[in-house]
Structures are given as structure tokens and as C-alpha cells.
Amino acid sequence: MSLVQSTAAMSFFRLSNLRCKSILGCGAFFILAALASPAATLPTGFTETEFGGSLSGAPTAMEFSPDGRLFICLQTGQVRIIKNGSLLATPFLSLSVDSSGERGLLGVAFDPNFFTNHYVYVYYTVPTFPIHNRVSRFTAAGDVTAPGSEVVILNLDNLSSATNHNGGALHFGPDGKLYIGVGENANGANAQTLSNLLGKVLRINSNGSIPTDNPFYNSATGNNRAIWALGLRNPFTFAFQPGMTRMFINDVGESTYEEINDGIAGSNYGWPVTEGPTNNPSFRSPIYFYQHDIGCAIVGGAFYNPPVLQFPSSYLGKYFFADLCAGWIHVFNPASGMTTDFASGINTPVDLHVGPDGALYYLDRGSGGQVFRVSALPAQALNISGRAAVETGQGVAISGFIVTGTVPKRVGVRAIGPSLANFGIADALMDPVLQLNRADGSLVMANDNWKNTQQAQLMAAGLAPANDNEAALIATLPAGNYSAIVSGKNGGTGVALAEVYDLDPTSNSRLANVSTRAHVGTDSDVLISGFITGNRIGATRVAIRALGPSLQKFGIANPLPDPQLALVNANGTLLASDDDWQTHQAQAAAITSYGLAPSNNLESAIAISLAPGSYTAIVTGKNNQTGVALIEVYDEQ
């Protein structure tokens, strides 16, 4: 990091009037060299991608909305949205703010009832005299703010001429209350008094009223009854552990320590009397701290407890945090109190969150502002299959798949029919015919009776079908979309199994996103898609969809009216199920974040992370309905 970048970054969190007469003279936080952000150094098995493009501004915070969009605060007063991986051109919100020093738009949060009331809360510095920080509520109207919807929730104390130590983090806790981190405005004495809100964590109701069970409700007066914890210098970031009541507060120190504090009601964390660990019984020591030889300003803070597991399970319950100046991300284990290195070489991280897809997102203030997504390399999909009732016309079975990567992929494709009778399938297709087509419908290869063409190759690959009337082929395919079409010879009908095998799993290309379209009947004639995951680092993160009603707009005359979806493992144990994809909010948010939201509410979807093994997705009709359905299995990285 250059000297210009380093001092610029440090001033936003650390410099006080005692250490620097003029913050701008020391290099204000928003003045950063426009250098390209280098790729972070990550552990083996992880990868990083830019998410959404340049923000063209100085970001301060970000938060995922309950529906999966990413909202990003710019210090100058704009809230930008990244939706389905793209930065929207129109800001969600544009405010007039005082953005001098560390002031500006500093935090955003979403009401627990966002799907109903569409309330969005922000923390910003009012630009008119007397200058102060404020929490306001706005109503979302899609991807923009409803005009005239601002409701002031809380006005904080008037600020001195010092423009640093504003805090700005705000999050709703598991109790439905709004928690707010407030800096001490470069005056340590503020942190030790109940006569103002500075240097504190506050707790209020969503409408701005103060809960009567706050720890200082009966000892403070007026708005100061909102104080929940005190003795903090600049709690710029904090986080709640999803599904738990635990809260970690990151406090930026002055000359010695950066702190992670256990957020406990009524606690006094000691600033300015003490910094870092203390034996004073009046103060609560941090649960983790580090000295300034490895960093200068703690930021971020996110527990790894996502609705969809994308990282290896060993990360569950761990706490990710970053340092603004040192440009690293570390992982804290609350159980052991130990930390491990995770990422280094980041330009200027200011915030990080775990997304609804289970990936880790960090906000980099360098190069005009960027978001980066860190994900575990998923396990390899080794083979995929679809079992369905094969009819004529639109009722043939179609299994689609995608080859990704930079080198061609060698695959084996089979159409199994007669040998299914050995597994109790009474109406098996007696003579399947197999076609492999490109996305434009052109033929790659075809086969009827596997011994006719590639017998030696199929036997060498271990793919020789059990019955001579079954079809199989081997092809080497460049990246692209492909369809394996199974029909009955001479118009024959019955249940068949289409299989696609990865015959070169160690190459840089992969099989992904399998789909099968066929008629869904009852009993053994339901639609089944099986897949096997191999053993790379990390779980395989998949999204599975069962589509029916929306097929009508593609010319399917008899789509399945209401598909139901179930996922089982090799032992037949049910792992997940869905009927109507919007029923489960967390899962719906993950599906939406992948850009895979079905167009009809009656269609089903599952987002899940899977360990190496064999899995089966099953589509049935609700109340024994029948019709054509499409099952899709997406490999999400």
C-alpha cells in the first residue's frame, strides 16, 4: 500500500485531534489513489471474483436485503444496489450529507418485516447547522426510494468541529430492536457518560421509541435511555450471529489495540480509561485484541452461519473480520479464542458480509469502490442423470447440461431402458434412441444400440450398458450448452434413464447445470434427476428447480400445473423439499441471488450445499397431477 493510501485509510478511523491538527492535512479517508485493486491471496480451494463492477465513489458500508439485493452506502450520500450481480444505474437513495472527514452516509439496515413494510434505515450526517448524525427510515419502492418517505427515527448529539469517530453501523438484533454504533466524536470523555449518546451502542424500537428494558432506562433521561453499552471509541462495525443472540462489537483503538468485544447489555468497555485487556472490574475486556504492529483499524465483522453452506463446514460459527490498513481478513474462532489468516493483499477493506449464497463478500474502498466475492471451489459434478417417462412428440425426455471452462470436456452419455426392469420399473422403454445436440439444435452424435459404433471405448470407460438395445456414446465437447434427447424407437414409450458422465474430472472444464424435461406421471413415472459430486475442497453448492406452469409460454401444451420438489441422498434420506418456491424466505432469497427465481409462484426450488456423494432430485405433481415438467440442477460457485 502506498503512503498516500495508508494515511488516507488510517484517517477515517484512527486520527484524533491529539494526533493530527487537521484530518485533511493527514490525508482524508475519501482521498484514495485510483489504483487497481490486486487480487487477494486466499487459502487453497478458494477463489475471488469482482461483484457488480466499480461503484464510482467512496463506499462505507453494505448490507444484503432480505430479498438478496446488496445495498452499498457511499460516503457522499448515495445508496447503490447490486441486483443479480449487476450494479443498477439509478441510486436507491441520494441524500445531502456532510461528508467531511469521516462523516457522511455510514450505515444501512432493513426492517425485520421488510417484505411487508419495505422499510430501509440509514445512518448519515446532517449537513445543516447544528451538524449531527441521524438515523432515518425510508420506504423502498422497488429499486428506488418512495418520494417523500423519509421519517426521522433518531437525531444524535450535535457534533464538535472534529469530523472523526462517528461510528455508523446499524443492525436489527434477534429481538427485533435496532442497534446503532456511535463514535465518541474524538472526545473520550463522551464514552463514559450517560448524558449523551456518543461512544455507545444504542438500542431502540423500529419506530424510534426506547425499549423500557434497556439497561440504563431508569438511570438516564430522554434519548439517553437508548444507551445499551458504553465505553467505546469508534464502533464502526458490529455483527449479530444469525440464529443466535450473540453480538460482537469491533472497536477501533487509538495507539495500541484493536478490539473484538462481546456485546452484552449494560457493559462498559473502558475507553478512554483503558484500551485492550484490563483487570479493572468496572470494565469488560475484549474477547480478542491485536496490536498495531499487524494492523491499525478493525473493520467488517461477519459470522459464518449462512442459510446455504458454501464454505467447508469447518468455518461454521467462525467470525470473519478485516483490517483497513493492513489489507487482510482473519477468522476468529469464538470457541478457542484463536485466529487464523484467511486473506491478504486487499487494497482498503471497509466492510464484509456473508451473503445469502454462503459466499463471503468484502467491500474495498480502493479504485473508486468495489465489492469482491470470495467462494470455495465447489466439488466437481462427476455424473448427472435424469429418469423420466418417455412419450412421443413433446413428451420425449430431454436432459440438458453445460460444459464450462477453457478446454474441451470428454463426456459419456447413455440412454438406459430395458435394464431398468431389474430395478422394479414395470414400464421401461424397451429400445431407447439417443441424440446429443448442440444449443442451436444441430446434431453432435446419435446412437441406437450401443454396440453399433463405440463399443470398445464404452467398455474401456466402464460405461457399457447391460442391455444391447440401450444407447450410449462418448464425445469430446467444447464449452457450451448441450441436450441429450431420449426417444423410443418406432414411437415406443416407457420409462428411461438419461445419464451424462464426466470422463475427465481433473481437467479445467466442468459439467454444470443439468436439466431434464419430460412427462410427470404418478408412482414410478415421476421425474427423477440424479447427480454425483466429487471431492474438491468445499461443498458443492447447488440450486434445483422444478418448473411446470411457465413451460406453457415455450409451447408445451400440457405443463405440470403445480410441481413439488424433493432431494434425497444415497440412503433415501430426505434432505430438503419445496412446494411453491417463495414459501421459505431465506431459501427464496438465495435462489433470487443466483438469478434463478422461477417466474411462477407454484414452481419449486431448493438451494443447498452438498458433501461429496450421490443425490436424487424428484419432481411429482401436487395431488397426483400429471403433465410435462422441467427439473434443473445448477452448480453455483
PLM regions and their residue ranges:
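Beta-propeller domain segments
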Residues: 41, 57, 103-105, 113-115, ...
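Conserved blade-ending motifs and adjacent loop-strand segments that build the rim/top face
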Residues: 338-356
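Asp-box/WD-like beta-propeller blade repeats and closely related beta-sheet repeat scaffolds
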Residues: 132-171
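Beta-strand-rich domains and repeat architectures in extracellular enzymes and scaffolds
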Residues: 52-77, 299
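A sequence-level detector for low-complexity, Ser/Thr- and acidic-rich stretches
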Residues: 378-637
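Surface loop/turn motifs at the tips and blade-to-blade linkers of beta-strand repeat domains
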Residues: 50-55, 92-100, 154-161, 227-231, ...
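A short helix->beta-strand "capping" segment at the edge of beta-propeller domains
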Residues: 40-55, 150, 285-287
